[in-house]
Amino acid sequence: MSENRNGLMELLGGGSLVEYNDQAQKAVMQFEARPEFCHSDGRVVQGGFVTAWMDAAMAHAIRRASQGEYSAVTLELKVTFVSATGPGPVVAEGWVVSMGRTVAFLEGRLFDGAGKLLATSSSTAKLARVNP
């Protein structure tokens, strides 16, 4: 499976996959929370970016867990904002809780560069064949 970066990941602040654990079916990605992603005088990242970072990590977990056969199409996504996210490096984790033939259940977390928990997420995703 290709790990080529695409335009969306660049727009989200880099989006590089830094680790994948086969046993845990867990993807870890790093992003840069840029000042232009922020409101409140540049101190707080807009929640859509926080959500997208965790969604991307969960989608990578599906791609890897299925050996590149499936992509995740989000059906439902819940996010809990634990603490304000500021500019700087952030780490998104996403993992497969359960994967059936057509639907997967996923969870994710977002941390700042010091390891502080910023947000959590859970998602239900439809499995879509990458190359039908």
Where are these regions (language model features)?
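Terminal targeting signals and extreme-terminal segments of soluble enzymes
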Residues: M1-P132
